[in-house]
Regions:
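Solvent-exposed, polar/charged alpha-helical surfaces in well-ordered, non-transmembrane soluble domains
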Residues: 53, 76, 80, 94, ...
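Short, solvent-exposed loop/beta-turn-alpha elements that line the ligand-binding surface or hinge
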Residues: 57, 209-214, 280-289
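Conserved C-terminal helix/tail region of periplasmic/extracytoplasmic solute-binding proteins
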Residues: 298-333
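Short polybasic/polar patches that bind polyanions
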Residues: 56, 154, 197, 262, ...
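Secondary-structure end/capping motifs
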Residues: 229-307
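Short, glycine-/small- and polar/acidic-enriched structural segments
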Residues: 26-161, 165-168, 184-190, 201-206, ...
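Short, low-complexity disordered leader/linker segments with a strong preference
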Residues: 1-34, 329-333
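Pocket-lining segment of extracytoplasmic ligand-binding domains
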Residues: 91, 166, 172-262
């Protein structure tokens, strides 16, 4: 059974379980509408949206579906019609969804940055130009953290391919590899990169924002085009919930950090450190950063991240949907 097949079976099983256990929705504008939302155990507003019932209180029935195969798995489930919404990184999403170009659109961002390059505390690496012939652990060869790492090297005049890459697949896996000495460099993401500094096994070399010289586009929601077409008001309510939950992170950091840490199954200190040291931050605007995304994926194209016969900058302009976020923000009190 291949990866896509395993992912779809897992999503179907999760939906079956949730359809049995989902509580009845309240009366409201969303009554009779079910939203299947895929999520990952990462730093996000999802746990706040869930605990505060921001969608359910409007009448929606929400199936919160855990995704274990990363954004590629979520993309497969969205394309197959098993998920309506998925949380993910805006840059990775362009690369991955370009293989199913009409399946979905990125509709609203919460964060910037989040992708960070760390080196071992035992390493003599001082800057990106020193990363040549090194062992580098990544979560995947086509992920956003790997892309921002390679952009940083390219900017420093270094050939990113002049290193040996190891794929860990998970954040905790990267922590373990660095701790064991299996790699000298980590192209990682929060909160696990923060954990490396707190454990004094690694130090931050540069962030995604450092790599591109501006706020690095981060994470947000991706919606299937079918769901957008059939339930545009539900899309707006989803964004209202996302933006309210993200506002909560800014206004109630102590409670939010605890909630996000429990959700991601990490220490609260790592989440707090990630925000306080600007390894991740709340975006200045929740509207997708089209210019930043297009500029970043243009470099991704040069670095070989694009699937065959795909022009990532052209696709990104189609994939980023700013209209819903702009409308929701314009009508906020």
């Amino acid at each position: 059974m291949n990866l896509v097949r395993r992912t779809l079976v897992a999503v179907a099983a999760s939906l079956a379980l949730f359809s049995i256990g989902t509580a009845g929705a309240a009366d409201g504008p969303g009554k009779g509408i079910t939203i299947n939302i895929g999520y990952f155990p990462v730093v996000s507003p999802v746990p706040i949206m869930r605990t505060q019932h921001l969608l359910e209180d409007k009448g929606y029935t929400v199936n919160w579906v855990p995704i274990t195969q990363g954004l590629p798995g979520a993309a497969s489930a969205v394309a197959a019609g098993q998920l309506d919404i998925a949380w993910g990184n805006s840059i990775s999403a362009v690369v991955i969804f370009s293989q199913s170009p009409d399946a979905a659109q990125f509709i609203g961002q919460s964060f910037i940055n989040a992708n960070v390059t760390v080196v071992s505390t035992k390493s003599d690496i001082k800057s990106a130009k020193d990363i040549v012939g090194k062992k580098v652990v990544v979560s995947g060869m086509k992920t956003a953290s790997t892309l921002f790492f390679q952009i940083g090297l390219k900017k420093a005049g270094v050939d990113p391919t002049a290193n040996e890459y190891f794929v860990s697949g998970t954040g905790p896996g990267m922590v373990g590899v660095l701790d064991s000495g299996g790699a000298e460099v980590v192209a990682g993401y929060v909160p696990y990169v923060a954990d490396m500094e707190l454990k004094k096994i690694g130090r931050v070399l540069f962030t995604g924002s450092d790599a591109i010289g501006r706020a690095a586009p981060g994470d947000g929601f991706i919606a299937s085009t079918k769901f957008i077409r059939e339930h545009p008001e539900a899309v707006k309510d989803l964004l209202r919930a996302q933006f309210a939950a993200t506002d909560y992170i800014k206004s109630n950091p102590n409670e939010a950090y605890k909630s996000m840490a429990e959700f991601a199954k990490v220490d609260e200190a790592a989440v707090r450190y990630s925000f306080e040291k600007n390894l991740i931050g709340v975006a200045s605007s929740y509207v997708p950063d089209v210019d930043g995304i297009v500029a970043t994926v243009a470099v991704a194209q040069e670095l070989g991240f694009a699937p065959k016969d795909v022009d990532l900058p052209t696709y990104a302009k189609k994939f980023e949907n700013t209209s819903f976020a702009r409308e929701v923000l314009a009508k906020r009190p």
